[in-house]
Design a protein with these regions (language model features):
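Zymogen propeptides/activation segments of proteases
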Residues: 1-207
Length: 207
């Protein structure tokens, strides 16, 4: 068995080998039972509350079972655990779970206020497609955020913005233009030093 450790999170980030004996359990039950048995290794205090089944999909060998992370019922963006099962056995676990999230999950500002802030920032007349309250991990810190997706704007510079607004103080955590240009899309966000910075992002199909 190979175990790779994440020093920052203090958890196993990847495990591979024959991790279980062959089982007739469903892939979902086999996976969540394994996580329950080894929850300390993955940094999960309560798997039944902190994980939700996202989907299962085919792997080159076997099948992946994907769980997304939850915090007080909210999705934790990027937080997940993926289990690979071959012939009734778990063979790999990839752990992106973010432990010890210290963020209050009751917002201070409303969705309407957050949407108005986002609209002013990107100067967009377009309506929003979707908006949701999430926990967003960005540059080593977790934020309670409104994730606001704006509809496609064809020009003069095509855009489909996704904006994360801090749900406690109304500051902008991250702005992404999710339209795929040649190469990369652009985004900007507040760094750990409090400075707004730009970066390249990639998103398949511009979705």
């Amino acid at each position: 068995v190979i175990v790779k450790w994440d020093e920052r999170r203090g958890v196993a980030k990847f495990i591979s080998g024959q991790l279980t004996e062959p089982s007739d359990k469903s892939k979902t039950d086999l996976s969540i039972d394994f996580i329950r048995q080894h929850k300390v290794l993955f940094g999960v205090e309560n798997p039944d509350k902190e994980l939700a089944l996202d989907n299962t999909n085919a792997a080159p060998r076997g099948r992946f079972v994907n769980f997304r992370q939850k915090k007080d019922g909210l999705d934790v963006i990027g937080g997940k655990i993926t289990v690979r099962i071959e012939n009734g056995m778990i063979t790999t676990v990839a752990n992106y779970f973010e432990p010890n999230i210290a963020v209050k999950t009751t917002p201070t500002i409303s969705l309407e206020e957050a949407t108005a802030i986002a609209r002013r920032e990107i100067i967009s007349p377009k309506q929003t497609d979707t908006a949701s309250l999430v926990v967003f991990h960005w540059e080593g810190k977790c934020y309670l955020s409104y994730r606001i997706d704006f509809r496609f704007n064809p020009g003069p510079e095509p855009s489909r913005y996704r904006v994360y607004i801090n749900a406690h103080d109304g500051t902008i955590v991250l702005i992404e233009n999710r339209v795929m240009h040649e190469g990369s899309a652009t985004g900007s966000g507040i760094g750990v030093d409090g400075v707004l910075k730009s970066f390249d992002t990639y998103e398949k199909g511009g979705a």
